[in-house]
Amino acid sequence: MAWLAADADFNPDQLGLNVIGIASEIARHDSGEHAHKMGQLLFTNSGSIRITLSGQLCILPPAHIAWIPPDTTHRAEMSQVTGYRSVYINTVQYPILPKEVKVLQVSSLLKEILERIAFADFDTDWSKRPFLDLLNVGLNEIETASSVSVILQFPTDRRLRKFLGTELLPHLNVFADLVGLSEKTIGRIFLRETGLNYQQWRQQWRFLKAIELLSKNEKISVISHHLGFSCESAFIAFFKRMSGKSPRMLIKKDQS
């Protein structure tokens, strides 16, 4: 295990191990764009992690795990994060892990296993019992865990990309005037390149931004105004519809 400072550089590929765990209490950190030969599981007890991938945005909520396959270029930005843990795994040795980026719900059992791996010594022999048993249970838990829709695909059309950033896009008719394309053309581009129509994409962006702001302990009144809702109750209803949970449940989970 390596207990890392927020500004520390760490390259798991240099160690030549099959399983590596690290832990940190990171308040704020930006990994920069990078990739590694090992797959990576990352999670946090509180706060969210913004993960930027090639053409995709992922917001990792607290008490969830993100799986990033080997050789996947990504950038992880953390704000107000505590209890950061990362587990690197050689997928040649353990091919059961997913081939694509996933965000998964974490059972109490899986969380405890990942915690133990994150704090294990680097020289732990994961090919021998009892460590092998622990690792196998963890891998089985990952295989059966439910995935969460917190990854947003961005359109690649250059006419649209320059308008897609950190702020909520306007309604379709306003955006069409801004871009200089018809509403139908924009709708076709979004559906073809993201799998979502414009309104669905806009709502998913809102949802991810809401998770990020909730994880920073922003007030619901502030979030609902920032995301263009008419009132708090409208935002709460939206969040429940998107996640099946109320915003306060996420906050409670974050602080537990």
Q: Where are each of the predicted segments found?
A:
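Generic protein-terminus/edge-of-domain signal
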Residues: M1-S48
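Short beta-strand segments in beta-sandwich/barrel cores
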Residues: S31, S46-T52, I65-A66, H74
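Short acidic-glycine-tyrosine-enriched beta hairpin
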Residues: G55-P70
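Short hydrophobic/aromatic patch on the recognition helix
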Residues: A63, I186, F190, A234-F235, ...
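Ligand-binding loop in jelly-roll beta-barrel domains
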Residues: T72-V101
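Aromatic/histidine-rich interaction motifs
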Residues: K99-K111, E115-R116
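Basic, amphipathic alpha-helical hairpins
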Residues: I117-T124, N140-V150, L160-V174, F190, ...
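Terminal helix-turn-helix DNA-binding modules in bacterial transcription factors
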Residues: N173, R192-E232, I236, K252-S256
